[in-house]
C-alpha cells in the first residue's frame, strides 16, 4: 500500500515538474525608432471616422494610436485629452488644412500632429480595418498678438476650394483584412511578446478583440510612416 502511494506521489511530482518546464514563454517584439538623434514631440488628434460604423469611436481610436506611438524610441507623445481640449478652445471639430494643424502644433508646443482616419471597420471574425495616418509637421504660422482662433478661421478651406500643395505633410494608408492569409500571419507575428502565451486565446486574441487588432493596424502604419525618407530628411 505504501509503495503504491509513493508511486502515485512520485508520478504527480514528475507531472508537475514537466508542466512547469513546458510552460510557454513570452516572445519579444521588435522595437520602433524615430529616425535621427534628436527627440520629437507629437500629438494625436481624434480619429476621423469615415467607415460608417459607430463602434469606431474617434477618441478610443486616437488613444489606441497614442499607445502605439508611446512605444517608439525617440518620441514623446502628448495625451489625447490635451489635444481635445485645444481643439475645443480653437473651435475645431476636425483638422481641415495644413495651416490649421500648424496652429494646433504651436499651441501644444509639439513638432507634429498625427491625424488617424478610419475608412473600414468590421470587428467580427475575421476582423477588417482600413485606416490612414496623416502627419502634419509644425511650420511657423503664428503671428504675435493674433488670436489663434482667428488664425484657424483664416486657415479653414472655403467650400469647393482646392487644397494647396503640402510640403510638410506625410501620409500612409492601409487595408488590413484578416481573411487575407498574409495579414493574418502578420497580426499573429505582431502578437508574439504582446500576449499571455498561457491565456485562453494566446496570440489569436488579437484576431478576436478589435481593440488589439486595431493596435496591430496602427503599429503597422507607424512602421511604414517611420520609413518615409521625408521624415528622416526633416531631422
Model-derived segments and spans:
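Envelope-exposed proteins and targeting segments
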Residues: 38-41, 73, 109-114, 127-132
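N-terminal segment of the mature soluble domain
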Residues: 52-117, 155-161, 168, 220-229
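Bacterial N-terminal signal peptides that target proteins for export
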Residues: 1-9
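Solvent-exposed coil/turn segments that connect beta secondary-structure elements
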Residues: 47-49, 82-83, 118-121, 132-141
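Bacterial N-terminal signal peptides
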Residues: 8-18
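C-terminal/domain-edge helix-coil "capping" segments
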Residues: 20-38, 124, 128, 137-235
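Solvent-exposed loop/turn segments connecting transmembrane beta-strands
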Residues: 53, 120-126
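Acidic/histidine-rich, surface-exposed loop or edge segments in extracytoplasmic proteins
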Residues: 38-52, 81-86, 197-201
Amino acid at each position: 500500500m505504501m509503495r503504491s502511494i509513493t508511486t502515485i506521489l512520485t508520478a504527480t511530482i514528475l507531472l508537475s515538474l514537466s508542466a512547469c518546464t513546458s510552460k510557454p514563454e513570452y516572445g519579444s517584439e521588435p522595437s520602433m525608432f524615430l529616425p535621427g538623434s534628436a527627440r520629437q514631440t507629437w500629438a494625436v488628434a481624434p480619429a476621423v471616422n469615415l467607415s460608417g460604423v459607430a463602434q469606431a469611436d474617434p477618441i478610443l481610436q486616437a488613444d489606441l494610436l497614442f499607445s502605439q506611438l508611446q512605444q517608439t524610441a525617440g518620441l514623446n507623445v502628448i495625451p489625447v485629452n490635451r489635444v481635445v481640449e485645444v481643439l475645443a478652445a480653437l473651435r475645431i471639430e476636425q483638422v481641415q488644412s495644413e495651416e490649421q494643424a500648424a496652429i494646433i502644433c504651436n499651441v501644444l508646443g509639439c513638432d507634429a500632429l498625427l491625424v488617424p482616419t478610419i475608412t473600414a471597420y468590421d470587428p467580427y471574425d475575421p476582423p477588417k480595418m482600413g485606416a490612414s495616418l496623416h502627419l502634419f509637421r509644425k511650420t511657423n504660422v503664428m503671428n504675435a498678438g493674433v488670436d489663434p482662433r482667428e488664425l484657424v478661421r483664416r486657415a479653414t478651406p472655403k467650400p469647393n476650394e482646392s487644397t494647396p500643395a503640402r510640403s510638410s505633410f506625410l501620409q500612409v494608408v492601409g487595408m488590413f483584412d484578416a481573411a487575407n492569409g498574409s495579414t493574418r500571419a502578420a497580426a499573429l507575428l505582431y502578437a508574439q511578446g504582446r500576449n499571455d502565451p498561457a491565456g485562453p486565446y494566446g496570440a489569436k486574441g488579437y484576431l478576436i478583440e478589435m481593440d488589439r487588432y486595431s493596435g496591430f493596424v496602427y503599429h503597422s502604419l507607424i512602421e511604414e510612416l517611420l520609413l518615409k525618407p521625408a521624415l528622416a530628411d526633416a531631422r
